[in-house]
Structure formats: C-alpha cells, structure tokens
Design a protein with these regions (language model features):
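Feature marks short, highly hydrophobic, charge-poor N-terminal signal-anchor/signal peptide-like helices
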Residues: 1-10
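Hydrophobic core of alpha-helical transmembrane segments in multi-pass integral membrane proteins
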Residues: 9-17
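N-terminal topogenic membrane-targeting module
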Residues: 19-82
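Polar/charged alpha-helical tracts
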Residues: 37-46, 50, 54-57, 137-138, ...
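Structured extramembrane domains adjacent to transmembrane segments
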Residues: 60-205
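A eukaryote-biased signal for long
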Residues: 164-256
Length: 256
C-alpha cells in the first residue's frame, strides 16, 4: 500500500503540473484597456462599500484628498475591480484602496505610491498576493500584508522612498486628471509582458492572453509547494526590510 502511494503521488503531481499550463492559458486574460467608470458608494457590494467608507475617512486624516471611486471593470479573468483613488497634492503622493469582487468573495488592500522624473516608482501596499508574471523593473513594490493601519503604512512608505530614492522629488498629476495615472499603470502591464513574450494581444485587440512561456510560468508558480515557498521567502524578506527601516530610523534619531 505504501509503495503504491509513493508511486502514485509523483504521478499525480506530474500530471497536475503538465495540465495546469493548458488550463491557465485557455482561461486567463488581462484587459487591454482600463475603462474607469465613476461609481457611487451605494452602488458597490456591501463589503466593498464599507471598506471604502472606512478608508476614505482614514486617508483624509492623513492629508489625502479623494479623487473618486471607480469601477475598473474585469481587468483579469473572473474578477471585477474597484478603486478608491486619493492624492496628496502637497507631497505628490498617491494612495488607493483596491477591491476585487471574486467568486470566492471580495478582497481588498491599501497602497501608497510615488513616481519620479527618472521613470521609477515605488509602491508600498498590503497586498498578500504575489505576482505570477515578471514585475516591472522600474516599479519597486513592497508588500507588507501584516500592516493594516494607513498611517503606519504611509510612514513605512516614506521610509522606503528615503532609502531607495534618496534626493528624488515625487512627481504629481494635474488636478482632475489624477486617476489617469492609475489607468496608465494598469494599461502598461499587457504591452510590457507582450514585449517579453509572456503575453500576446488577442485577435480582437481587447485583451492579452498568455503565451506558452507565460502559461508555464504562471501555472507552475501558482501551484503548491512552489507558492508556499515563495510566500515564505517573501514574508521573510519583508520582515527583514521592516527591521532595516527601523534600524535606519533609530540611527537617524541618534544623529539628530
């Protein structure tokens, strides 16, 4: 019996790893356009509306003005995304609450971001989902899922900017056009991955679909035990980053 299990288990695992790219490639799509539609809070899913309302008050206390709440449409397969977008024009910092309506229930995270004249940007968020396709090398993303308070996350974001973009001044956006920055970031994802041959634009030009290269990478990185190992490594890296930031802050206080 034990010998049978030892033989069957690798066979099943191998079959799953062999079939997963086919399933992912046939199902996964990324929208080519980010069609942002303003939406009132009372038209949102009850849980998403409550989360946006709570965060709007918290961000206002931090000096961030609400740009608006938007329906982003189906940016990826089997999801519908919504965003509450904020801007602090005094510091040229941006913030957002992103929520996704999914078959297994809504999920959300908060984020602060800064962009610079050299084309780089730094994002600090609470998103626990790791990307399965290569990230933009010009966008440094720090994911601290253990942080829930916007004030704490903003403090960490500013420490991260000071560490990784010293001397660079954040760039703002003209008033009443701030949300276009969000649209540019989202719409830049597909073409960038297509240039790296992980995705390709479908015949209708409305969405990007995975190439075999992208499907294999996405499927295998999303399967256990790879996903477990990736999360453990990332969690350790972010804990180390927080300790490093704390050490830098303490050293700065001692010099003051």
């Amino acid at each position: 019996m034990f010998k049978s299990i030892v033989w069957i288990a690798p066979f099943i695992a191998g079959t799953i790893y062999a079939l997963a790219p086919f399933l992912v490639r046939s199902a996964f799509r990324v929208a080519a356009r980010c069609e942002l539609e303003p939406i009132a809070l009372d038209r949102l899913h009850k849980e998403i509306s409550a989360e946006f309302n709570r965060r709007i008050a918290e961000f206002a206390n931090l000096g961030f003005e609400l740009v608006g709440t938007f329906d982003c449409g189906a940016l990826t397969s089997d999801t519908r995304s919504y965003v509450a977008y904020f801007c602090n024009h005094a510091t040229n910092e941006f913030a957002n609450v992103t929520a996704m309506a999914r078959p297994n229930g809504p999920a959300s995270y908060i984020e602060f971001s800064s962009q610079f004249s050299n084309g780089r940007s730094i994002e600090t968020n609470t998103n626990a989902i790791l990307p399965l396709l290569p990230a933009n090398p010009n966008h440094q993303v720090f994911r601290f899922e253990s942080i829930d308070e916007p004030r704490t996350l903003l403090q960490v974001h500013r420490q991260v900017v000071e560490k990784y973009a010293p001397g660079l001044c954040p760039l703002g956006e003209p008033r009443d056009t701030e949300i276009q920055r969000y649209a540019r970031i989202v719409e830049g994802c597909g073409p960038r991955l297509a240039a790296a041959e992980y995705m390709t634009l479908d015949d209708g030009g409305e969405a990007f679909r995975l190439t075999w290269k992208g499907a294999v990478r996405m499927a295998w990185l999303g399967l256990w035990p790879v996903t477990f190992v990736r999360r453990a490594i990332h969690r350790h890296a972010m804990q180390s980053e927080l300790k490093s930031l704390q050490t830098r802050a303490e050293a700065a206080l001692q010099k003051a």
